[in-house]
Amino acid sequence: MKKLTSKGIEDLIPYPPGKPIEELEREMGIKGSIKLASNENPLGPSPMAIQAIKDNLNILHRYPDGSGYYLKSKLSKKYNVPLDQIILGNGSNELIELTVRAFLSPGDHVVQASPTFLLYEKMVKAAGGQMASVPLSNFRIDLNEVLKAVTPKTKIIFINNPNNPTGSVLLREEMLHFLNDVPDDVIVVLDEAYIEFVSDEAVATGLELLTHHPLLLVLRTFSKLYGLAGLRIGYGFASKKPIDYMNRIRQPFNANTLAQAAANAALEDSEFTSQTLKIVRDGLRYLYQSLNDMELEYIPTQTNFFLIKVPQGGKKIYELMLKEGVIIRSMDSYGLPQYIRINVGLREENERFIKTLRKVQS
C-alpha cells in the first residue's frame, strides 16, 4: 500500500476519540456507565432542537439547503456578521480540514501551541505541511513564542481559545497585540469551540477581533453548549475572501437538514443554555472542592472540562476507572502522561466520579 498512499498520512494514527458508553458496556459486560471524556453537554440536546428535528423528519427525502441560508441568516442576525462572511461545516472539524485544504501546499509551514487540539497537526501532516509546535507556558499559550515561530513559509497559525485540553484562555490585550504583529498574509485560525463557557470578561471573542487582522478565521460549534455533538454542525466567521475559497472545495450538502434545523432552533433556546452554564459552574465548584479535599492538583478552567494530575499516571487511572464504568480521558496522546481530563457532568455523575477516583487511588 505504501506506493499508493499519500506520503503525508503514512505515519499518522487515527484520532483517539472518547470511548462510547455502548462500547465500554459491550466489552466489559457492565451497565449504568457514565462518560465524562468528550466535553459533551450533560443535559443532552436543547429541547427546542429536538422539536425542530421532529418537525423536519418528513422532508428527509429532499437534499439539504446547500447554502445553509436560514441558519446562516440566524447567525448573521445574532452576531451582526454579513451572510457572505459565514460558512457552515459538518462540525467545526470539517472547517479545520477545509482551511488546510484551501490554503496549504506541501512544504508550507503551520504554527500551533502544544498541547492543543490533536486534529490541527493531523490535517497539516496529511496535506504535506510542516507543523511547528510551541510549548505552553504554565499551561497557557504564549503568543510571543508563537510569533517567534512564524517564518516566511508560514501560511496558517492555529490558536485554540479556550485551549483544549488545558481550559486556559487568552485575554483581549494579548490577542490584540498578537493580531497586530502577525503578518497580513498569514491565516489565523481562532478555534472557539468552548468560548460560550468563558466567564472572564477580559477575554475577547473572535467576533470582537475580526477587524483586527485581514485573515482571521473564527470557528465555533454547536456540539458543546448546545448539546448537538451527534449532528455534526459548526460554523465559521471570516472576511469574504477566505470564505469564498473554502466554499470552492466544500461539499455541496455538508450540513444536513436535521443539523441545520436543530442548530437554528438551539440558538433561540436561552433557557437551555443558561441552565447548562449553571450546571457547569456549580459542578466545577463541587469538583474543585472535592479534589482539594483529596489533595490532588488540577488546572482551573474557563470551560466545561479541566485537567487533574494523578500520581499513578493518567493511563493507569483511565483503565481503572473504565472497570468501574466511568469513562474519562487519559492525556498520554497530548503529551501529559500524569494527567486525566474530565468534563463536568450532572451532580450525580460528578459525585460518582469523585467516589470512583477515591476508590481507584486507595
Residue ranges, per PLM feature:
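Phosphate-binding glycine-rich loop
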Residues: 61, 66-109
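Active-site pre-lysine segment of PLP-dependent enzymes
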Residues: 143-152, 165-188, 192-223
